[in-house]
Each structure stands twice: as C-alpha cells, then as structure tokens.
A protein has these predicted regions:
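Core dinuclear metal-dependent hydrolase active-site scaffold
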Residues: 49-52, 59-65, 71-76, 82, ...
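Zn-dependent metallo-beta-lactamase
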Residues: 1-111, 294-300
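Active-site metal-binding loops of divalent metal-dependent hydrolases
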Residues: 52, 86-89, 140, 160, ...
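Active-site metal-binding motif and surrounding structural segment of the metallo-beta-lactamase
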Residues: 97-156
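Cap/insert and terminal regions of metallo-dependent hydrolase folds
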Residues: 10-15, 106-122, 229-300
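Histidine-centered catalytic micro-motifs
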Residues: 135-145, 213-221, 271-276
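Short, low-complexity, polybasic intrinsically disordered segments
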Residues: 145-161, 166-168, 284-300
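Metallo-beta-lactamase
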Residues: 30, 34-38, 113-130, 159-213, ...
Length: 300
C-alpha cells in the first residue's frame, strides 16, 4: 500500500486536522460512549507534543463541568465493519468513577474517567442495526476494551497487550481482567521487518487498513492507518497521551517519538480517543450522547 506523506520522520498533531470531507463521512463514524462530569479532564492537545511536553495531560477542576469523551470508531471498509475500541462495560453504569493508572502511585496528572452514563457502544451499534465483523482494540485499558463482551466477537490486540493483561498487577493498572476473560483472543502480529514511515512495525488488517506500532502509553499500543477514499486517518487510541507514572522512562520516550512524528504528516488526520475537538470538528452537537451518523448504505 502506498500511503501518501508517510515517509521519513514526518507526521501530524494529536488532534483532528481540519473537518471531515464528504468522502470520509461515508466510511467513518465516531460514537461518544460516556463523558459527563469527570473529576479530571484531558485538555485537547492542539499544539505539537514536542512543544507542550507533559502538558498533554493536565488536571482541571471538576467545577468546569466539561465531560471527557470516550470514543470508539466504526470503520467501514469494502470488506468489513470494524469496531476500533469498544468503550466501557455496562458494569460501569451507575458504578462510580474509575481510575486509570496504578493504584499504588496515582499522580496529579492521572486522568479519572466517569461512570458510563447512557448507552454503551454495543447498545448504540445495535440500535443502529449494524453488525460489526471485527473488534480491534488500540490497547486494553478498560475504557477501550471492557465493552467487548456485549459485542460477542473475538477481541484483537497486539501480543504485548495480551501479555500485559496476564501480569499480576494488570487490574490495578487499568486492565479489565474479568471482562476480557470472557472473550476469545486474537493477536495482531506486528512485523518489525515491515516499518511504515515513522512507525517501526506494522501488520496488515485488510486491504484498506494497517496496524502500526505506537507503544508508549501502554507496552502494546497500536494505531490503525486507514484509507478512506481520498483521505487517510490514524485512529490512535491513547498513543498521544503520556503515562504520568513513568515520565522519563521508555514509555514516555516512545510516546514522544510517535507524537513528534505525528506533528508533521499533513496527509494524515489523527483521531484520538479522548479529544473533544474530534466531536466539534466532525459535526458539533449532533455527535454528542447516543447520536451517530449512519454508515453509507452502499457499504452495509
């Protein structure tokens, strides 16, 4: 696959660059799963990470009343409908706030997520009458993977993420051990002999989608590069959000390397998982709550 602009050490900022065009709308829709009144909020990163550094995640007052979205994406290609990140399990509905980060060393910058308030991603997909073919998780933190049980499909993630899930402290690090014990595993095998532009390893998902190595936020984080007609997108999960418990370690350096690369690729639109600019840039208030744009009928 020839990806325009994916050469050398260049790429784009970790927030959506420009609005979706009509052709992109045919293929991609975002679902906001939750995001009401968290204790902490992520501030959308609208500048190059090399400039904003550790301010990619900041602590804000609860009094702001600004919710943080937890975004899952439905990626429709000619071959299949893929759920990319599946949000929170219904067990978080009315269950209080969750802490994503190590229980033994919470930091001021560690984000707190709200309880699930409203329909889960799977419930929204069912209401739209859609039947996904695959579920791919950029990483296995609970706000990206715990909703998988409802979808009734195997979960695909990198080998490094599955290995992290099996470690003794996985649950305290934000991995939904109990929920993921109920779903079949599929491993995406990243090939270091197949780098793609600034990404050190890749794996083909189908003719229109490639998984790339964006380890840093977690040891096995991946992102998906997708061809959407004339547009290219990178669904990056939390790859551009640093781990605050390891600010100077390899995780931070990996995140910073990817973010620097993403700062200069003008041909690529970057879709993070917790950035309100994605919602505003796509369709304003129409994207809030359970509202979602239907998949184009030509590609059902």
């Amino acid at each position: 696959m020839n990806l325009p602009g994916l050469t050398g050490d260049r790429v784009l900022p970790p927030a959506l660059r420009g609005p979706f065009n009509a052709e992109s709308r045919r293929w991609l829709e975002a679902l906001e799963v939750a995001g009401h009144d968290p204790i902490h909020n992520l501030r959308p990163c609208r500048v190059k990470p090399v400039a904003c550094g550790r301010l990619a995640i900041v602590q804000e007052s609860r009094r702001t009343g600004v919710g943080i979205p937890i975004l899952g994406y439905l990626l429709q290609t000619p071959d299949e409908l893929i759920v990319v990140d599946c949000g929170l399990s219904p067990r978080w509905r009315g269950g209080g706030q969750i802490h994503l980060g190590p229980d033994d060393s919470p930091s001021p910058g560690t984000p707190y997520m709200p309880e699930l308030d409203g329909p889960s991603l799977a419930e929204q997909v069912a209401e739209m009458g859609l039947k996904p073919d695959r579920v791919i998780c950029t990483h296995l933190h609970e706000d990206h993977s715990s909703g998988a049980v409802e979808l009734g499909l195997p979960v695909e993630a990198s080998g490094a993420e599955w290995a992290r899930l099996d470690e003794s402290d996985a649950e305290s690090r934000g991995y939904p051990v109990d929920e993921l014990a109920e779903v079949p595993r599929r491993t995406i095998e990243l090939d270091p002999s197949a780098p793609l532009g600034p990404f050190l390893a890749s794996a083909r998902i189908n003719t229109d989608v490639i998984a790339v190595d964006t380890a840093g936020h977690t040891p096995g984080s991946i992102s998906l590069v997708a061809s959407l007609g004339s547009a290219w997108v990178l669904i990056c999960g939390d790859a551009v959000y640093p781990r605050m418990d390891d600010p100077d370690g390899p995780a931070w350096r990996g995140m910073l390397r990817i973010s620097r690369a993403l700062a200069d690729l003008p041909a690529l639109r970057v879709l993070p998982a917790h950035d309100t600019t994605v919602l505003r840039a796509v369709d304003g208030d129409a994207w809030m709550g359970a509202a979602a744009m239907p998949v184009d009928s030509d590609h059902d």
